[in-house]
Amino acid sequence: MSVLTVPRQTPRQRLPVLPCHVGDPDLWFADTPAGLEVAKTLCVSCPIRRQCLAAALQRAEPWGVWGGEIFDQGSIVSHKRPRGRPRKDAVA
């Protein structure tokens, strides 16, 4: 049996705290538009936001908040409408 030793990290070597790694991970896949907006807001200060978005686009993520953007059916949308009846008026 071998033992894996992990060197201690100094404060400068520590990885940054990422918003998606603390709290409720389901927030980034919320069912409600309000929950998704909270996740987007938390992404604003993330140090790897651009890399996260680029990786999500490359992987063709189907849904969730990635890099501060909402993905719905594989496309980036500005906001997600709540479930319910569709609009009565046609969208131009």
From Swiss-Prot:
Cofactor(s), names only, from the UniProt record: [4Fe-4S] cluster
Cellular component, GO, one term: cytoplasm
Main location: cytoplasm
Induction text: By sublethal doses of antibiotics such as erythromycin, streptomycin and tetracycline as well as the fatty acids palmitic and oleic acid (in clinical strain 1254). By the antibiotic erythromycin. Positively regulates its own expression (in strain H37Rv).
Binding-site residues, [4Fe-4S] cluster: 20, 43, 46, 52
Pfam families reported for this sequence: AT_hook, Whib
InterPro entries from the UniProt entry: 4FE4S_WBL (IPR034768), AT_hook_DNA-bd_motif (IPR017956), Whib (IPR003482)
Free-text comment on the cofactor: Binds 1 [4Fe-4S] cluster per subunit. Contains 1 [2Fe-2S] cluster after reconstitution of overexpressed protein from E.coli. Following nitrosylation of the [4Fe-4S] cluster binds 1 [4Fe-8(NO)] cluster per subunit.
DNA-binding region(s), residue ranges: 80-91
Biological process per Gene Ontology, one example term: cell redox homeostasis
Localization in the cell: Cytoplasm
Record-level Gene Ontology MF annotations: 4 iron, 4 sulfur cluster binding; dinitrosyl-iron complex binding; DNA binding; metal ion binding; protein-disulfide reductase [NAD(P)H] activity
Residues of the 4Fe-4S Wbl-type domain: 19-76
Keywords noted in UniProt: 4Fe-4S, Antibiotic resistance, Cytoplasm, Disulfide bond, DNA-binding, Iron, Iron-sulfur, Metal-binding, Transcription, Transcription regulation
Domain of life: Bacteria
Disruption phenotype: Decreased resistance to macrolides, a lincosamide, and an aminoglycoside antibiotic.
Post-translational modification: The Fe-S cluster can be nitrosylated by nitric oxide (NO).
Record flagged with keyword Cell membrane: no
Job of this protein: The apo- but not holo-form probably binds DNA. Acts as a transcriptional regulator. Probably redox-responsive. Upon overproduction at least 10 other genes are up-regulated, among them are Rv1258c, Rv1988, Rv2301, Rv2416c, Rv2725c and whiB7 itself. Probably redox-responsive. The apo-form has been shown to act as a protein disulfide reductase.
Record-stated family: Belongs to the WhiB family.
Name the record gives this protein: Probable transcriptional regulator WhiB7
